[in-house]
A protein has these predicted regions:
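TPR-adjacent "capping" and linker segments in tetratricopeptide-repeat scaffold/adaptor proteins
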Residues: 15-32
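Conserved alpha-helical positions within TPR/SEL1-like repeat arrays
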Residues: 38, 65-76, 99-110, 133-144, ...
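Structural signature of tandem alpha-helical TPR/SEL1-like repeats
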Residues: 42-51, 76-89, 109-123, 133, ...
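Non-heme Fe(II)/2-oxoglutarate
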Residues: 355-449, 470
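Amphipathic alpha-helical repeat scaffolds
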Residues: 34, 38-42, 54, 292, ...
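Catalytic core of non-heme Fe(II) oxygenases with the double-stranded beta-helix
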Residues: 416-430, 434-533, 538-544, 549-564
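Structural marker of alpha-solenoid helical repeat scaffolds
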Residues: 59, 93, 127, 161, ...
Length: 564
């Protein structure tokens, strides 16, 4: 702190002392002190602001304004716990103190407690429906929680209040991208760039959309344009690395990841991808080092643990891979991604009984007829309405690069307005899910049965395949239960008995894993109106088919939900 700052602080401390007599003088003194505290916070002197707040609170422990600013000072000095306590106390004394609710949401958001952050922002909005900050912050939280449709709506309300707020347009584009509405998201990014041509985030996010659309040349040129603006932009370097890896330009990908890490050393996802690319290059020791660093940074990441376990498999060490799985699952019971990898590790460790128990298709793979909603005359009418809705859906695009679909189209979220026939489909699906949950064995020893979510939310999308279309082996790592409903099938697929082209297959992991033993496979023949439900950690794929006609299906996830 320089001499002028010390002089200013000394004056502020003097101003914080009570002056004059009577309540009016005290109120004026507090108002004056609060203004000085706010100025200190805005100028980056949080420690000094906190010290003055403590003095004021000693005389005025119930003043919500002092409690609120004291909380901000505590948070800015790294004391989130005290900040929460002060804000909750402020709200107790003044329940309609909208700034305190919003600030409480900010602290919870920064600490990763997104559910409490959501609650705080919604309370702020209930008190003051036109409160811009709460709408915008709520959008950020909802987007982080994987609820992009709600996030888009929150951003829209924020922009209705403050239409010139550029980050709101950028984030709306991100939410639309997550919803699979790529053309709309590009419009938002382009609008941002019209206003601010050197906005590196808009260039980077636009490149990510081009990547999803498999317009790889445009993606690369857009990323490089972003890097011309800011050569050390870590997120752009990371995305460039992903693209270069996809194009099998592995050495260039390594360079991009290393530059991203140099710009942001604690970028855990970048360490994961660097390890994965090193593994592809056969540089196993360097790959292991990258994975271990990622685990240090993010010990709760199932993906990096699975990648490290796969490295052990490539070295012929299945027991080490299995031990890694068990240690992780001891801390994260029922984690979908790790259960999927454990099924590989068990097989490679020659644990036949363990593999069969984890992948028990007899107990956990369930097929049923969805049933026709009363609004429709019969199954044909219902499926025709669904097919028309899907094929006209604005989010239906050629398969995004990050998805499992090949030679087909993929929609975004279908459970958003206008839902059309999807509303009746969802109602029937929820009934089927409840029947499935109720029929599960009461087996606390099995990780799938043990991790039944008390509450859940649904997400659904469509896959439209034509000749040669298929899905490569994959899982749904964020979900507990997944499934598929068949809307329409090519006649030859519907009529097939021995030819399994177009069927769904369970058991085969993706090619990038280094298992040597053949997985046990289970096949299900699709038929229009059939609903298939299965644990989200079951690897599954669609067998390619060569036939005229469309294979239209609706896939869905049951996502554990712990919201308000």
């Amino acid at each position: 702190m320089n001499r002028n700052d010390r002089r200013r602080l000394k004056k502020t401390r003097r101003g914080a002392r009570p002056k004059g007599n009577g309540p009016e003088a005290t109120a004026r003194d507090i108002d004056s002190s609060l203004g000085r505290i706010a100025a200190l916070l805005q100028s980056g002197h949080a420690n000094d602001a906190r010290e003055i707040c403590q003095s004021l609170l000693a005389e005025n422990p119930d003043d919500p304004r002092v409690l609120n600013l004291g909380a901000i000072a505590c948070f800015q000095t790294g004391d989130a716990s005290t900040a929460v306590t002060l804000l909750e106390t402020a709200i107790e004394h003044q329940p309609d103190f909208v700034d305190a609710h919003n600030n409480l949401g900010n602290v919870h958001k920064a600490e990763g407690d997104l559910l409490r952050a959501e609650t705080a922002y919604r309370q702020a909005i209930q008190i003051a429906p036109m409160y811009f900050d709460a709408h915008y912050n709520l959008g950020i939280v909802l987007e982080t929680m994987g609820r992009p449709a709600e996030a888009r709506d929150s951003y829209a309300r924020a922009l209705d209040i403050q239409p010139d707020f550029l980050p709101g347009y950028l984030n709306t584009g991100n939410a639309l991208k997550a919803l699979g509405k790529f053309d709309e998201s590009l419009e938002y990014y382009r609008w941002v760039l019209e206003v601010e041509p050197r906005n590196v985030d808009a260039h980077n996010n636009m490149g990510a959309v081009f990547y999803e659309l498999r317009r790889f040349d445009e993606a690369e040129s857009t990323y490089r344009k972003a890097l011309e603006i800011e050569s050390g932009h870590a997120d752009t370097l990371y995305n460039l690395g992903v693209l270069l890896h996809e194009l099998e330009r592995y050495e260039e990908a390594v360079d991009a990841y290393q530059r991203a890490i140099a710009a942001r050393p604690h970028y855990s996802e970048c360490h994961v991808n660097l390890g994965y690319t090193m593994h592809r290059l056969g540089r196993l020791d360097e790959a292991e080092g990258a994975y271990q660093r990622a685990i240090e940074l993010d010990p709760d990441s199932a993906q990096v643990h699975a990648n490290l376990g796969d490295l052990y498999l490539s070295r012929g060490e299945p027991q080490a891979a299995l031990a890694l799985c068990d240690r992780f699952l001891d801390r994260h019971a029922g984690d979908t991604g790790m259960l999927a990898f454990k099924s590989i590790a068990l097989r490679e460790a020659d644990d036949v009984d363990g593999t069969r128990a984890l992948l028990d298709v007899e107990r956990f793979l369930h097929t049923t007829e969805l049933g026709v909603p009363t609004e429709f005359a019969d199954l044909d009418a219902f499926n025709t309405a669904l097919a028309e809705h899907i094929c006209a859906h604005p989010s239906l695009v050629d398969a995004p690069a990050s998805h499992a679909t090949r030679h087909g189209k993929h929609s975004g979220e279908l459970l958003i307005e206008p839902r059309g026939p999807m509303a009746a489909w969802e109602a029937r699906l929820r009934e089927a899910i409840e029947e499935y949950r109720a029929a599960l064995p009461n087996d606390s020893a099995h990780p799938f049965a043990e991790s039944i979510p008390a509450r859940y939310r649904l997400t659904a999308w469509s896959v439209v395949l034509e000749s040669q279309g298929h899905q490569i082996p994959h899982i749904h790592p964020s979900a507990w239960l997944s499934g598929v409903y068949y809307v329409a099938l090519p006649p030859s697929v519907a009529a097939s008995r021995e030819n399994t082209a177009g069927w769904i297959e369970f058991g085969q992991p993706p090619d990038h894993y280094h298992g040597k033993l053949q997985a046990a496979l289970s096949l299900e023949k699709p038929r229009e109106g059939l609903l298939v439900l299965f644990p989200s950690y079951f690897f599954h794929r669609t067998i390619p088919f060569d036939a005229a006609g469309q294979r239209i299906s609706i896939a869905f996830d049951v996502l554990p939900y712990r919201g308000p």
